């Protein structure tokens, strides 16, 4: 397989041939090959505007186990990327605290969450997050200084129209102070845990799986 950077550059060439000047690298789980491609774009079009956006779980990690804080910092320190962001995977309420923790990196921030979380209804995947919830959570980020807002999976023109209405109603505000990103602590497997003791002793244990909430609005 070709290195990721070469794949990105091959695709970029097709867009450059059509006169593209704005580029969005999105739903990324790592930075593999990204900066190689961005460097190529900047050499071809020095005033190109490039956004790099990562898909992050609510705990702040990508599916490859990389922390969004570290990825965003690498993009900022490269001096090549014009804006960094988060998109997909998480709903607005879960993405908002992650976005707030990235406001200190020194680049404009892009936030494009899913409408909510997917559910399967009659073999069809649907997102039950309501436009009002999506717009309300996104507008909070705008009030705190996020410059680029949008939507990913499950968002519709109705979601975007609701967001536009919320943004139009916002008064001018001062950006909030950035929140430091803390690294989740690893569990201490040595501590006294009744469940673990029973497993180690070969005793019968009972585990219950709970369905996820039916609505992504946890407020």
Q: Where does each model-flagged region fall?
A:
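Domain-level signal for soluble alpha/beta catalytic cores
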Residues: 1-219
